[in-house]
Amino acid sequence: MKSHVRSFKTYIRDEIIKKGGWVNAHAHADRAFTMTPEKIGIYHSSNLQQKWDLVDEVKRTSSVDDYYARFCQSIELMISQGVTAFGTFVDIDPICEDRAIIAAHKAREVYKHDIILKFANQTLKGVIEPTARKWFDIGAEMVDMIGGLPYRDELDYGRGLEAMDILLDKAKSLGIMCHVHVDQFNNPSEKETEQLCDKTIEHGMEGRVVGIHGISIGSHSKEYRYKLYEKMRKAKMMMIACPMAWIDSNRKEDLMPFHNALTPADEMIPEVSLLP
């Protein structure tokens, strides 16, 4: 009798478990499981920037207990899938204040023997507006990594670079890493990854900064991409490929290299990797 042939999925799962299990490096667990049939139409017709504010309703009406329930459900789902380390952004801003992060810490205490949990503060309201800045400063003391969204302050005030300064100053003062959403919109006019590299070196944060998404990198010319990889190497910058933001990209007539939603890791790894 022939031995049972495992599926490719099973093979990959087993091999990853042998090496210590999956790592989910980027999530927003505080807002998980909040989509409803009534909201689908609104979200379907809205772009990513609009969704940054559409979630205000959920944030405003969620209690610590509501957030705690969603964190627990998210964590248990990760554990069931073989995830051993889970990094999630947590909203801390004028809308939800500190309710989500209080719930996050409560959940981490419950699951501390089952999974490694790390938190970064999500700054959907930016860090320039005074009340948003207040909650950024409060939240920074309650997380493991500083999180940021410079494009919010670029969109609202034209001050995206200043937002990067604030994020990196805070991370450096606290001695922790900084995870920053960059280049999400599949647009060759976006150069946030390069800007973040420059700011990382300026602030002496080499090796402690992570870019998230990087979708627009692939929309640039090959010459630009390889110059960027050299900057990333100098900044010792890491990237988290998170292609889901692509789903919000509208049809456009810009001419650009043909590419998919993934950060161009096939090019990036040999050019940026610090491993021998």
UniProtKB/Swiss-Prot annotation:
Keywords: Signal
Keyword Signal carried by entry: yes
InterPro entries attached to this UniProt entry: Metal_Hydrolase, Metallo-hydrolase_Enzymes
Domain of life from the UniProt record: Bacteria
Signal peptide coordinates: 1-29
UniProt keyword annotation of Metal-binding present: no
Family membership: Belongs to the metallo-dependent hydrolases superfamily.
Designated name of the protein: Uncharacterized protein HI_0842
